[in-house]
Amino acid sequence: MASILTSRDVKVINFLEDSNIVLNAAQIGKIFYSEQARDDKSSLKIAQKRLKKMIDLKYVKRFRSYSNQQYYYFIGSKVPKLTEHKLLISEFITRMAEDNFELESVKLEWTHFQKDYHLRPDAFISFKYLSHNFYILLECDSSKKFTNEDKYYKLFTDRKNSLEIQEVLPLKRVLIVSLCDVKTETSKITPVWIKNDFSNFSQLKYQFVK
């Protein structure tokens, strides 16, 4: 595999397989091939070329969205259903990569705390920034506002005295991000609010420089 594919190709394959996420060629270019490219157009061309190789070797599959006629790439036995939530998550992590956040892993519909806290964030994102490990609990609410204030408040309150929770969600290393068009107004917790059109995406990086 390594003799035929590049190390970047292997990262693409592993990422798609581990996350069950779908990405288009432009997004894959920005996340995985931007260091080799001059600009977004160049990274897209590189990604398209490498993805063709991965498809020819049957490591990756693709399907076309009838709504926008784009190809989306995935690994799995069934063609995944394209939902607004999944598209928002794919674009969110792409924006992260563009802002020099180093993606480590993405877990969709993360259920680690579902039993005890009735929480299932749309994505649990592990990443590095300035060589430090961080985590995002991502809540996508395309048609409503953030609604899990009390549940997250209990989880983060319990975390203060629970080493078990801290092993999963280290202190001062976790952000709750509310991806929706309605600004979150809470008194107990403070999610980072990102609009669905990503026009205020700079708010994420601001959390690391303020």
Q: Over which residues does each language-model region extend?
A:
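Catalytic cores of nucleic-acid endonucleases
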Residues: 140-191
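Alpha-helix termini
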Residues: 35-39, 100, 127-130, 158-169
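Hydrophobic, Leu/Ile/Phe/Ala-enriched alpha-helical segments that form helix-helix packing faces
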Residues: 16, 32, 51-58, 92-100, ...
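Conserved catalytic cores of phosphodiester-cleaving nucleases, focusing on short active-site segments
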Residues: 92, 119-160
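Active-site metal-binding core of divalent-cation-utilizing nuclease and nuclease-like domains
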Residues: 81, 98-134, 144
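Short, amphipathic alpha-helical interaction segments positioned at domain boundaries
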Residues: 75-100
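Nuclease-adjacent, charged terminal/linker segments that flank catalytic cores
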Residues: 1-79
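Charged, structured surface patches that assemble and position nucleic-acid processing machinery
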Residues: 188-210
